[in-house]
Amino acid sequence: SDSMVMVNLKLLIHMVGDMHCPSHIVYTKDFGMPGYSLKIKGKKVGRHKFWDGAPQYMHPKWKADRFVKAYDTYTPKEIKKICKGDAYKWSVQNANNILKTGNYWERGAEFTKFSKEQRKQIDETLHEQLAYGGYRLAATLNKIFSK
């Protein structure tokens, strides 16, 4: 039915997006990731809230079209490689990529005092994860609707 298609589309869009967000990857083992929480202008912000809002924290004046221009930088050949595989492969790849984010800052660090290198690391992760998530969602939707 149409309502079932709508529900499935909403779930697909939500899940593909979430699997590319560093705060939505959960490990069964504690890897000692010290960068769990931080402060933004003195207010404690958890890792989850930070990564969900990272695009706005990093680039508060950007609108959606600016993110597209900045992050949609891969060639068609690279996009094809990025979209290879399935959700399981993508999740494993993301979990491995995201493990490094725990060392971007010390627990309780103040975001406004992050170094250029720390901001660069965060922005590189944003670039990759947002682009990969978008490309993979588009590929999945194209696969579904090309039938």
Q: Where are the regions a protein language model picked out?
A:
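Soluble secreted/lumenal catalytic domains
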Residues: 1-49, 58, 116-147
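An amphipathic alpha-helical core segment
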Residues: 37-127
